[in-house]
């Protein structure tokens, strides 16, 4: 249920998500993907959290991780529902970041969640420079 006091703000979130989705799908001559990392906040301003590689089923060196940072994969303009992929937060030492503030680098993953963007009242865009940012010669653990 969308409350009256959040209705306009919710529509604002949907519009922002649509704009970011368009930006990410815009192509240019460089053939590089544009990824705009986002954090979504619930009505009590708690960041959305999701888990990737639960049960360590994917063959990667990190195992299960928690994140509040996502990439928009898809949004349905009529329902304001869509799909987010989880961005893996990495600290400056190449390990999974334990907090958002420890995040030095973001890595794309194949882990996704489906969301209703009407459930959120705030969206924070993070720097695109975080995505696949070099660790400065540090080898990930």
Predicted regions and their residues:
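Short glycine-rich, low-complexity segments
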Residues: 1-141
């Amino acid at each position: 249920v969308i409350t009256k006091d959040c209705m306009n703000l919710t529509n604002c979130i949907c519009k922002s998500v649509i704009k970011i989705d368009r930006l990410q799908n815009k192509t240019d001559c460089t053939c590089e993907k544009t990824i705009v990392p986002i954090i979504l906040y619930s009505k009590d301003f708690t960041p959305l959290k999701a888990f990737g590689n639960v049960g360590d089923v994917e063959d990667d060196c990190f195992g299960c991780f928690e994140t509040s940072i996502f990439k928009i994969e898809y949004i349905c303009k009529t329902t304001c529902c869509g799909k987010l992929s989880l961005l893996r937060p990495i600290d400056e030492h190449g390990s999974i970041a334990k907090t958002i503030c420890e995040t030095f680098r973001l890595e794309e993953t194949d882990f996704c969640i489906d969301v209703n963007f009407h459930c959120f009242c705030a969206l924070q865009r993070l720097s695109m420079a975080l995505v696949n940012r070099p660790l400065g010669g540090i080898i990930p653990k």
